[in-house]
């Protein structure tokens, strides 16, 4: 399904072990707000939900977009799966549409541009959205952990998938 609902405010969220990345967009290449929220200590899901509630209050999104953590072969932790369900319940309680895309669907929406993995998708997004260029993390080495900034690009990829693929 191709969503071409430009003008609709979309909050894309990408929860991680360290917190979450988010992007707010009204069209596929025009972000309004973005960033990461670092969450430490116990009660990470509760803290994440509080941050998300603040984002919802600030931006009044028409839709929330998430990665589907239940996709067969997925590697999301049990905590993240619970958090995604809680985010969906929070959105439902505020009459906000929730859209969850499998990682394979996100990758497919960037196929025509030649991007096949997370890093290539992030590079493509940074080229298309100048505001994101300075946040592009360096290519991850096998022995390093993924940069927290990559969650911004994962969230942006989800939002762009919602609006429809970008070409070239």
Tell where the protein language model's regions lie, with residue ranges.
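Phosphate- and other anionic-substrate recognition elements at nucleic-acid/protein interfaces
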Residues: 1-168
